[in-house]
Curated annotation (Swiss-Prot):
It holds the Pfam family Glutaminase. It catalyses: L-glutamine + H2O = L-glutamate + NH4(+). Keywords: Acetylation, Hydrolase. The gene is glsA1. This is Glutaminase 1. Its EC number is 3.5.1.2. Changing K69A: Loss of activity. It comes from Escherichia coli (strain K12). SUPFAM superfamilies: beta-lactamase/transpeptidase-like. Substrate binds at S66, N117, E161, N168, Y192, Y244, V262.
Length: 310
């Protein structure tokens, strides 16, 4: 049994030590994100037996952004299976920025990773759907099943992103021309933009992590969301590419599958034990929350979790 006092102390200490850390800046290429108060910070744990521990602004709802890629990957694995995902998307780090076009050009148009923009747009196109609205509703539903029913599209975020997503539209057409997009290019880009524009709070983000940690069963609803056999593929992708250009450094220092988003959220999974999440808007040059990385790493270190430990 996990010690409740120890878990709350770990969360409290991480928040106290790092919630006012200086450094980084909000994402400024999406107007909505540029205006989120930079002083916000939160950290939370949700365990596989459904206990919740949090500190800071844990009720504040922020944009899911790139963490949505984990949810859509999970749905694609359910729809088409791991072999098709590997064949049609890939399972390798690109070694380049998350929005790189060069990565596509270097590999014949294949996106390699479902956790970079090109691969995520291709993954969105893999979802079984008869039209754009069905594709979107299925992706929203998997987000809600994984994290909580309160997850919802923000029209403000979506509008802010849809008016600035020209780079992703270009990526979608490159994928389409290379044969690595499996629906209409602008449909894929539209739905991908929507999936990044949902709002959730830090506890819900930790619940997403706990659902993965529990082999696909949401520990708060007790409902099976994913096949247990598909979860290791998600965690492997998170370990390789979850923090963009910092993924190797994160694996080396923290040793947990993770995923960040430019909305300031960051998630880590301790398989079989818990999800750890944090939120704070200022980002490093790779697009990861400066304080969030420190808070999650602190919790993991205090509790002694690292998947590479014996």
């Amino acid at each position: 049994m996990l010690d409740a006092n120890k878990l709350q102390q770990a969360v409290d200490q991480a928040y106290t030590q790092f919630h006012s850390l200086n450094g980084g800046q909000n994402a400024d290429y999406i107007p909505f994100l540029a205006n989120v108060p930079g002083q916000l910070a939160a950290v939370a744990i949700v365990t596989c037996d459904g206990n919740v521990y949090s500190a800071g602004d844990s009720d504040y709802r922020f944009a899911l952004e790139s963490i949505s890629k984990v949810c859509t990957l999970a749905l694609a694995l359910e729809d088409v299976g791991p072999q098709a995902v590997q064949d049609k998307i890939g399972a390798d780090p690109t070694g380049l920025p998350f929005n790189s076009v060069i990565a596509l050009e270097l590999h014949g148009g294949k996106p390699l990773s479902p956790l970079v923009n090109a691969g995520a747009i291709a993954t969105t196109s893999l979802i079984n759907a008869e039209n754009v609205e069905q594709r979107w509703q299925r992706i929203l539903h998997i987000q809600q099943q994984l994290a909580g029913e309160q997850v919802a599209l923000s029209d403000e975020v979506n509008q802010s992103e849809q008016t600035t997503n020209f780079h992703n539209r270009a990526i979608a057409w490159l994928l389409y021309s290379a044969g690595y997009l499996y629906c209409d290019a602008m449909e894929a880009c539209d739905v991908y933009t929507r999936q990044c524009s949902t709002l959730l709070n830090t506890i819900e983000l930790a619940t997403l992590g706990a659902t993965l940690a529990a082999g696909g069963v949401n520990p708060l609803t007790h409902k099976r969301v994913l096949q247990a056999d598909n979860v290791p593929y998600i965690l492997a992708e998170m370990m390789m590419e979850g923090l963009y250009g910092r993924s190797g450094d994160w694996a080396y220092r923290v040793g947990l599958p993770g995923k960040s988003g430019v909305g300031g959220g960051i998630l880590a999974v301790v398989p079989g034990v818990m999800g750890i999440a944090a939120f704070s808007p200022p980002l490093d040059e790779d697009g990861n929350s400066v304080r969030g990385q420190k808070m999650v790493a602190s919790v993991a270190k205090q509790l002694g979790y690292n998947v590479f430990k014996g």
